């Protein structure tokens, strides 16, 4: 299975070690799925991790380490050129296009994107965890 994690999911995973986003990241580290990243996604993540409101929660070195880890261990894909407009926030369209181009599921905490789940393979971190967990034996 392949997944694109919205930068908001990655940031949530860093800020709280107990929530669904952190569990998703742990599953990736354990090899449960391939994490698809792109230069644009990594740039957005790096910028967001430097926001003043996050600096008290994550050091610049920790932020840089995370971006390097994702770049080194993730599946680095090319950013699709000029993604079509699909999301109420045009800044998120590249995530949908990246997931589609890489045949991956998009995992997001953004309600605008989650509202498009009927048309595109988009799930919340909790919903993605349900897909990763094996079904109990009957």
Question: What kind of feature is each model-predicted range?
Answer:
Residues 43-44, 83-86, 128-133:
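A short acidic, often aromatic-flanked loop/helix-cap motif at beta-alpha or helix-coil junctions
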Residues 8, 18, 39, 64, ...:
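Alpha-helix N-cap/helix-start capping motif
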Residues 103-107, 111-138:
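Acidic, PIN/NYN-like endoribonuclease modules and their adjacent C-terminal/linker elements
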Residues 1-37:
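Short, well-structured N-terminal submotif of metal-dependent ribonuclease cores
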């Amino acid at each position: 299975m392949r997944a694109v994690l919205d930068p908001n999911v990655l940031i949530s995973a860093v800020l709280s070690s107990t929530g669904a986003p952190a569990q998703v990241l742990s599953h990736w580290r354990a090899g449960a799925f391939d994490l698809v990243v792109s230069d644009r996604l990594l740039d957005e993540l790096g910028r967001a991790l430097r926001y003043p409101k996050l600096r008290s929660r994550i050091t610049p070195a920790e932020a840089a380490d995370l971006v390097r880890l994702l770049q080194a261990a993730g599946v680095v894909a090319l950013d699709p050129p000029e993604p079509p407009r699909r999301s109420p926030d045009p800044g998120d369209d590249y995530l949908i296009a990246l997931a589609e181009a890489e045949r991956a599921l998009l995992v997001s905490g953004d309600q605008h994107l989650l509202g498009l789940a009927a048309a595109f393979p988009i799930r919340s971190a909790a919903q993605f965890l349900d897909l990763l967990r094996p079904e109990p034996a009957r």
